[in-house]
Amino acid sequence: MTTETGTWTVKKGLAEMLKGGVIMDVTTPEQAKIAEEAGACAVMALERVPADIRAAGGVARMADPTVILRIMDAVTIPVMAKARIGHFVEAQVLESLGIDYIDESEVLTPADDLFHINKNDFKVPFVCGARNLGEALRRIGEGAAMIRTKGEPGTGNVVEAVRHARQVMSEIRKLTTLPKEERMSFAKEIGAPYELVCLVAETGRLPVVNFAAGGIATPADAALMMQLGVDGVFVGSGIFKSGDPIRRAKAIVAATTHYNDPKVIAEVSKDLGEPMVGIEIPTIPAEQRMQERGW
């Protein structure tokens, strides 16, 4: 099998086109159209949103290609889909469908508990989750063109996304102050490629776009993550598990765009109906926390 590969620079550029935007999880063509009309920059095609995956338990796999193709036919914006961690054949299938981006996602049950997908083998850009700088740079070293916080998906609780965003940024700040001779030890300490550690030290940021994901449920949540310094947001269960998905979708897009304007955020937050029911993180057993998946 011959694989056409896109260069990492090209794939990174495709991901940068989504900067400042909102990516919404959708399970039907109708939801995809709502997301597009609300101003989403892309949609994530799924059979079940993370809250339903969490509630159902069992093994969560790649969505049925028919579901993905119907969503792709319904909208003109880019469509993403999820593959299991390490499941390179699911990724090959998604690429063959013509998907725009692949999310190697901890929301699905990992297929490989030792290795992630070698993303350099694919022409389609990959997005991967990270809780810290080491995870982010390992994924980029494997070819990821976009990073997102892991958060804790399907909870409607933004606390873990905040923790992961702050952790990455804190480690970047620390790295930029290190003398050059200490960079190799730092790379060893966090388990990251030395060349990428040096690049981050020189630029003061990740070499790819960094979005927030996992628990974003309100316009204020989205604005919070943007003010913390991320490049955009993923919203999973927070829209279509709420009382008024259309209004909430538009409000989250507006809050992401005008994240530094509390008056706009206040205005779009009015009369949105009930948000999704949230889950306190300490009530989730450690073995059921999706953020722990991957390494």
UniProtKB/Swiss-Prot annotation:
Pathway assignment reads: Cofactor biosynthesis; pyridoxal 5'-phosphate biosynthesis
Pfam family of the protein (one): SOR_SNZ
Q: Which InterPro entries match?
A: Aldolase_TIM (IPR013785), PdxS/SNZ (IPR001852), PdxS/SNZ_N (IPR033755), RibuloseP-bd_barrel (IPR011060)
- Reaction(s) catalysed by this chain's protein: aldehydo-D-ribose 5-phosphate + D-glyceraldehyde 3-phosphate + L-glutamine = pyridoxal 5'-phosphate + L-glutamate + phosphate + 3 H2O + H(+)
Q: Where does D-ribose 5-phosphate bind?
A: 25, 154, 215, 236-237
EC numbers: 4.3.3.6
**Annotated catalytic residues:** 82
Chain positions recorded as D-glyceraldehyde 3-phosphate binding sites: 166
What is known about what this protein does?
Catalyzes the formation of pyridoxal 5'-phosphate from ribose 5-phosphate (RBP), glyceraldehyde 3-phosphate (G3P) and ammonia. The ammonia is provided by the PdxT subunit. Can also use ribulose 5-phosphate and dihydroxyacetone phosphate as substrates, resulting from enzyme-catalyzed isomerization of RBP and G3P, respectively.
Protein name, as recorded: Pyridoxal 5'-phosphate synthase subunit PdxS
Organism, as annotated: Heliobacterium modesticaldum (strain ATCC 51547 / Ice1)
